[in-house]
């Protein structure tokens, strides 16, 4: 089982949806943040193993936050997501140090679950 997870999105309804998805996959320790500042506070306190970050945040963007998280002295799996499915977001997420990018309409994808849990296709 993974350690704490963090969902970062300025829309509380989206955060709630992502939390429900993660709980449905068996994850219990899930934090929420609505801004870059809240995310950084959470990260420094709880040291999550996975952070799901929306691109658009009120005090920055998910790519900048991903770069800041990469500077932390422990390993985190960072996934960037957005309602904008522009293919350029994949490359931008990778450059920012994220392990992947998902459009918000694909958040229920088994591929996302495997990615955040660091599993291959043939693992249960």
Residue ranges and their predicted role:
Residues 12-31:
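Two-component/phosphorelay signaling modules centered on CheY-like receiver
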Residues 32-50:
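Acidic, metal-coordinating helix/loop segments flanking the phosphotransfer/catalytic sites
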Residues 35, 61-64:
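Acidic catalytic/metal-coordinating carboxylates
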Residues 58:
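The feature encodes the CheY-like receiver
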């Amino acid at each position: 089982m993974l350690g704490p997870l963090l969902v970062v999105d300025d829309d509380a309804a989206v955060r709630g949806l992502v939390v429900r998805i993660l709980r449905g996959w068996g994850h219990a320790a899930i934090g929420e943040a609505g801004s870059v500042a809240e995310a950084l506070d959470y990260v420094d306190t709880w040291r999550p193993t996975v952070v799901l970050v929306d691109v658009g945040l009120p005090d920055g963007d998910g790519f900048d936050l991903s770069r800041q998280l990469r500077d932390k002295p422990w390993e985190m799996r960072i996934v960037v997501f957005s309602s904008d499915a522009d293919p350029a977001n994949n490359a931008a997420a990778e450059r920012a140090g994220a392990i992947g990018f998902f459009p918000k309409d694909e958040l229920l994808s088994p591929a996302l679950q495997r990615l955040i849990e660091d599993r291959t296709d043939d693992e249960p």
